[in-house]
Swiss-Prot record:
Residue sites binding substrate per the record: 36, 58-60, 90-99, 216, 234
Catalytic activity of the protein: orotidine 5'-phosphate + H(+) = UMP + CO2
SMART domains: OMPdecase
Gene Ontology terms, MF aspect: orotidine-5'-phosphate decarboxylase activity
Protein name, UniProt field: Orotidine 5'-phosphate decarboxylase
Pathway annotation: Pyrimidine metabolism; UMP biosynthesis via de novo pathway; UMP from orotate: step 2/2
GO BP: 'de novo' pyrimidine nucleobase biosynthetic process; 'de novo' UMP biosynthetic process
Lineage: Eukaryota, Fungi, Dikarya, Ascomycota, Saccharomycotina
Annotated InterPro entries: Aldolase_TIM, OMPdecase, OMPdecase_AS, OMPdeCOase_dom, RibuloseP-bd_barrel
Domain of life: Eukaryota
Organism listed in the record: Pichia angusta (Yeast)
Family membership: Belongs to the OMP decarboxylase family.
A cellular-component GO term for this protein: cytosol
Gene that this sequence comes from: URA3
Keywords annotated in UniProt: Decarboxylase, Lyase, Pyrimidine biosynthesis
Active-site residues per Swiss-Prot or TrEMBL entry: 92
Amino acid sequence: MYKSYGERAKSHPSKVASRLLNLMESKQTNLCASVDVTKTQELLELLDKLGPYICLVKTHIDIVEDFSYEHTILPLQGLAKKHNFMIFEDRKFADIGNTVKLQYKGGIYRTSKWADITNAHGVTGAGIVEGLKQAAEESTDEPRGLLMLAELSSKGSLATGEYTQKTVEIAKSDKEFVIGFIAQRDMGGREEGFDWLIMTPGVGLDDKGDSLGQQYRTVDEVMQTGTDVIIVGRGLFGKGRDPEVEGKRYRNAGWEAYKRRIA
């Protein structure tokens, strides 16, 4: 039996996860927009249109060619406030603890200062969690959350089997900072007191894949296997699609699938 987002928010040990779950409940959306565009203006214009329909935006800030903190991040934060969504920088950290600490809080992006959520691979072990947590604590008073990459949506991904299980074990090292997984299904943990959020990429209502190995599953498919947040990218704005029309369509599909799951 699945609990509602609101019920889970009340008892969640993470302030970030609790805030996101409450936002999802009040805004009636479990849609995360993956906005992989290379210009600041396009990023901001898309998010102004998609903002009313999403709980979260997933960025790859290092592909923005005209990036600046003042002209990219500050307006992005303004849109997040205006439309009431949170920010997830899909950085996929994968180095030793000390290095990821420097990467997360420094450089030109200073990700820990503005992204509510980021993510990491488990390949280097549990030190990556501690390094990222230290960076967050040293650079901001705002709560931050980490997703571990347990599974990927691309064809031939190596994140399966024993690797996935060991990533789950790493996630258990910090109940407050690690809020869940990028995964294709429920990762369990409830019997040990964990309430992980599952965010699933590769969700599409129309296409089944692309020429570079991406594989899409439907909203209903992913919700029935334990997903909490559906991550949609090109389905919202690619191939000349209208982001407002598609945003509403995916938001409604995700919410209806969620209601069926908790009924």
